[in-house]
Amino acid sequence: MAPLRKTYVLKLYVAGNTPNSVRALKTLNNILEKEFKGVYALKVIDVLKNPQLAEEDKILATPTLAKVLPPPVRRIIGDLSNREKVLIGLDLLYEEIGDQAEDDLGLE
């Protein structure tokens, strides 16, 4: 039986439809579709339309990307254009490498 894959729950906080917001979403979608296709959920939150959500989650700047699940919560604030920095910042790159090493060794 194949092992269950983790589902990654992410929130992207943006401020309207600005060039920075559009670029952050496009870049993030590219990374997620390439690296985590089918095992992630992304919620985009416009802090101009939903300021209460930003306040509840203590978001002070945009764009902010938060990995909610699996724990621990991790955040990246600002530029999301560097794939490796995004994956490392969210603590996803090391999991990816660890999972690949386990696959190579036949571990579960």
Curated annotation (Swiss-Prot):
How activity varies with pH is as follows:
Stable from pH 4.0 to 10.
Q: Does the keyword Cell membrane apply?
A: no
Q: What is the effect of changing K11A?
A: Loss of circadian rhythm
- Activity under varying temperature: Stable from 4 to 40 degrees Celsius.
Q: Does the keyword Magnesium apply?
A: no
Q: Which SUPFAM superfamilies has this protein been placed in?
A: Thioredoxin-like
**InterPro entries attached here?**
Circ_KaiB (IPR013474), KaiB-like (IPR039022), KaiB_domain (IPR011649), Thioredoxin-like_sf (IPR036249)
In terms of PANTHER family, this protein maps to: CIRCADIAN CLOCK PROTEIN KAIB2 (PTHR41709:SF2), KAIB-LIKE PROTEIN 1 (PTHR41709)
Q: Which NCBIfam families match?
A: circ_KaiB, PRK09301.1
Give the function comment from the record.
Key component of the KaiABC oscillator complex, which constitutes the main circadian regulator in cyanobacteria. Its composition changes during the circadian cycle to control KaiC phosphorylation. KaiA stimulates KaiC autophosphorylation, while KaiB sequesters KaiA, leading to KaiC autodephosphorylation. KaiA binding to KaiC yields KaiA(2-4):KaiC(6) complexes which stimulate KaiC autophosphorylation. Phospho-Ser-431 KaiC accumulation triggers binding of KaiB to form the KaiB(6):KaiC(6) complex, leading to changes in the output regulators CikA and SasA. A metamorphic protein which reversibly switches between an inactive tetrameric fold and a rare, thioredoxin-like monomeric fold (KaiB(fs)). KaiB(fs) binds phospho-KaiC, KaiA and CikA. KaiA and CikA compete for binding to KaiB(fs), and KaiB(fs) and SasA compete for binding to KaiC, thus the clock oscillator and output signal pathway are tightly coupled.
Family per record: Belongs to the KaiB family.
Q: What is this protein called?
A: Circadian clock oscillator protein KaiB
